Amino acid sequence: MHLSPQEKDKLLIVTAALLAERRLQRGLKLNHPEAVAWLSFLVLEGARDGKNVADLMQEGSTWLSRDQVMEGIPELVDEVQIEAVFPDGTKLVTLHDPIR
């Protein structure tokens, strides 16, 4: 199997996001890489499900709360940008202050 660098990046995001999901289910707080991976994964999956950029940007601030991440993480993650594939092409989705 030959994967492009972009495909490898997406697989790494999915792996980290699945770990983050398991930790959230166990009641653990996410660190910086886990929080970013989780948010990125939800954008990628939302695009795959047919949601549009505006909806994902709006929903993005509801996916993680301050109580679900380690201290100081909301301030570190002031913006998350991820390129996602939509039915009409690849678009950049930006989540502003996604952890509230």
Swiss-Prot record:
CDD domains: Urease_gamma. Belongs to the urease gamma subunit family. It comes from Synechococcus sp. (strain CC9311). The keyword Cytoplasm applies. It is found in: Cytoplasm. It is an enzyme of class 3 (hydrolase). Keywords: Cytoplasm, Hydrolase. HAMAP family: Urease_gamma (MF_00739). One of its GO terms (biological process) is urea catabolic process. Its EC number is 3.5.1.5. GO terms for cellular component: cytoplasm. This is Urease subunit gamma. GO terms for molecular function: nickel cation binding; urease activity. The gene is ureA. The lineage of its organism: Bacteria, Bacillati, Cyanobacteriota, Cyanophyceae, Synechococcales. Heterotrimer of UreA (gamma), UreB (beta) and UreC (alpha) subunits. Three heterotrimers associate to form the active enzyme. Pathway: Nitrogen metabolism; urea degradation; CO(2) and NH(3) from urea (urease route): step 1/1.
